């Protein structure tokens, strides 16, 4: 174990904490990428089952992860028909009157991803 003089203790502690924070950030970024990729695949699968049709809507689901100096954020979205997701998930009005029932295919996946992400972040902190 290295001996640190008392006048340099604050520098040593700061250095250790910066390394620890860097390790956590790296681990959380990896978890975010993994969860986003898993989520896009899960929404594709649930959209095929819930919506049917030609498959264009289901195949359009993708994810994107952005990393800045202070944060890593992930987004799962439909690149081919982005406006359709809300209408299919929640239902919509018909031209001649009446409503079309929603087909929830995003919300169940979202709930599972939130649980997986929280668990992944906890593991990322524990392993750092």
Predicted regions and their residues:
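Short, Lys/Arg-rich flexible segments
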Residues: 1-79, 90-128
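Aromatic/pi-system hotspot detector in well-structured domains
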Residues: 86
């Amino acid at each position: 174990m290295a001996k640190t003089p008392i006048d340099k203790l604050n520098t040593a502690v700061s250095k250790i904490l910066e390394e620890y924070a860097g390790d956590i950030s790296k681990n959380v970024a990896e978890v975010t990428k993994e969860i986003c990729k898993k989520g896009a695949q899960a929404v594709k699968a649930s959209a095929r089952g819930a919506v049917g049709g030609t498959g264009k809507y289901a195949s359009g689901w993708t994810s994107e992860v952005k990393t800045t100096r202070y944060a890593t954020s992930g987004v799962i979205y439909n690149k081919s028909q982005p406006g359709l997701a809300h209408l299919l998930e929640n239902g919509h009005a018909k031209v001649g009157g009446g409503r079309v029932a929603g087909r929830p295919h995003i919300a169940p996946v979202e709930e599972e991803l939130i649980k997986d992400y929280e668990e992944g972040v906890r593991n990322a902190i524990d392993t750092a």
